[in-house]
A protein has these predicted regions:
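Residue-level signal for inorganic ion chemistry
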Residues: 33, 75, 116, 145, ...
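Residue-level detector of alpha-helix initiation sites
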Residues: 24, 82, 120-124, 287, ...
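N-terminal leader/targeting and accessory segments in enzymes
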Residues: 1-100, 104, 282
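Nucleotide phosphate-binding/pyrophosphate-handling subdomain across enzymes
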Residues: 2-17, 27-36, 139, 274-380
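Phosphate-binding loop of NTP-binding sites
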Residues: 34-35, 67-70, 79-227, 231-241, ...
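Short internal beta-strands
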Residues: 39-45, 224-227, 358-360, 379-388
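Beta-strand->loop->alpha-helix junctions that form or flank phosphate-binding loops
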Residues: 44, 61-63, 99-103, 240-257, ...
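C-terminal helical cap/extension that packs against the catalytic core
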Residues: 52, 59, 370-424, 459
Length: 459
């Protein structure tokens, strides 16, 4: 049996690896496995021609997972595959080690790893951290849940003549489910709020996967976490080699906040690191993201100048409280990435009043949308709901706000526009997944921009 705690002793030429899932991460893991000389077998539930084309000449099966998967020494599981599928259970019964693509790729790099997880804000934070590393002269490889699959970056690293490389990873709870020896030098946890409860039994099960990162840090590394998050503050308060960031207190923080100004050292230091008002990001949740990235970068040894310059020059990531434009003094913001309650609350809190809020899509699992009410009061003038979750949202919020139901996403935005007046803000922050009408949140956000463009042109 393969000893996953002694990777260096494995003879890869004699090792059979089954890869479950032929999406981006699965194909990348297969390419990396082929490079190291392992025997690769890919099993994919779909049988689409595109999937088959991506697999290429490797040994594979499509249209379901047969017992051929069990003819393996290691199973690499793609993150989108739930743990309760029968073939996973059978692998467990036969004691076949199951690892994530993240765990697998980590075996083949000696470069430092900066890894971040959390419920909301991950992509903005890791992109900013990535820019800080580049600004400091590092070869930064952005991957995981954003950018390239980790395996693809590791393979490129192995086959290219690059120096001073660092892996910056965004990690979802799914990607953390089967880690073993994965040990980043710097690990960050932004926040934990209810999400993916269609996959996890409850918030505790979901939080456990996120918190797993805190126990997988290199012995010389650091854990960076948000002291304002109640789950993190309680769970990680006794963690050694940890540094916190906070909007509410400066104790134990390297970067300290005074109003919108951030200092390294004491708050009366005249040489501030940056003023949040000088950045291109909106909303105090983004100030939190900046503090997280800056703290991780500082812990890694990135220069103060590189941190400052990256913050000031950073451009917001699409679909994350993205200002799309203005029509007749009505602003349009695309926050399609806000697929849960906490993300929507953070977006709504970024505005003072006159909000027309678009909610809806596919509910992730018995969501209590009334949690939005305290934040929406005095800010939201009306709500437009759409999609599979639209009627349930209407049932929960109808007594509190003027509310209109639209079955279709485009109708929802057109209705919001028709109901708007000069000085209003139309905010798409749906608090739901996109899978009822779109392939992903990016497609939904792009549709928002497309409709806005038509409205702007008067079409």
């Amino acid at each position: 049996m393969i000893d996953l705690n002694n990777i260096s002793k494995i003879n890869w030429a004699n090792t059979r690896i089954s890869i479950l899932g032929a999406g981006k991460s699965g194909i990348a893991a297969a390419a990396l496995g082929t490079h190291i000389g392992a025997q690769i077998f890919i099993s994919e539930d779909s049988d689409s021609p595109e999937i088959i084309e991506n697999i290429g000449e490797l040994k594979y099966e499509v249209g379901g997972h047969s017992n051929s998967v069990l003819d393996a020494d290691i199973l690499v599981k793609s993150p989108g595959i739930p743990n309760d599928v029968p073939i996973i259970k059978e692998c467990e019964n036969q004691n076949i080690p199951i690892v994530s693509e993240i765990e697998f790729a980590s075996w083949f790099t000696t470069s430092p790893i900066l890894a971040l997880t959390g419920s909301n804000g991950k992509t903005t934070t890791v992109n900013l951290l990535h820019e800080m590393c580049i600004s400091d002269g590092r070869t930064s490889l952005l991957g995981g849940n954003v950018g390239m699959p980790f395996s693809e970056n590791v393979l490129w690293e192995l086959t290219s003549n690059i120096e001073n490389s660092v892996h910056v990873l965004e990690l979802s709870s799914f990607q953390l489910e089967h880690i073993n020896t994965f040990s980043p030098l710097i690990a960050g946890i932004l926040n934990i709020s209810p999400d993916h409860l269609d996959r996890y039994a409850d918030i505790n099960a979901y939080a456990a996967e996120k918190l797993k990162l805190a126990t997988h840090i290199d012995k010389t590394g650091w854990l960076v976490f948000n002291a304002d998050d109640p789950i993190l503050a309680k769970s990680l308060k006794d963690t050694t080699r940890s540094i916190v960031f906070s909007l509410k207190q400066n104790e134990k923080c390297h970067f300290k906040l005074n109003a919108t100004k951030v200092y390294s050292g004491e708050v009366d230091d005249p040489d501030i690191l940056f003023n949040f008002e000088d950045t291109k990001l909106k909303g105090f949740h983004n100030l939190q993201n900046i503090l997280a990235a800056a703290t991780m970068a500082h812990s890694f040894g990135i220069s103060r100048e590189a941190i400052h310059n990256s913050i000031i020059n950073f451009t917001p990531i699409p679909h994350r409280l993205e200002w799309v434009g203005s029509i007749q003094n009505v602003d349009f913001f695309n926050d399609s990435k806000a697929t849960n309650i906490a993300a929507a609350i953070a977006a709504i809190e970024s505005f003072d009043d006159n909000l027309i809020l678009i909610l809806g899509g596919k509910d992730k699992g018995s969501t209590d949308f009334t949690q939005l009410i305290p934040t929406m009061e005095n800010r939201v003038k009306s709500i437009i709901v759409y999609g599979d979750a639209g009627r349930e949202i209407k049932n929960q919020l109808n007594e509190n706000f003027p509310l209109t139901y639209c079955g279709d996403f485009e109708d929802a935005l057109l209705t919001a526009n028709n109901n708007s007046n000069a000085g209003d803000t139309i905010l798409l922050s749906p608090a739901c997944a996109s899978f009822d009408q779109f392939s992903n949140y990016e497609e939904r956000g792009n549709k928002f921009v497309e409709i806005f463009t038509k409205l702007e042109l008067g079409n």
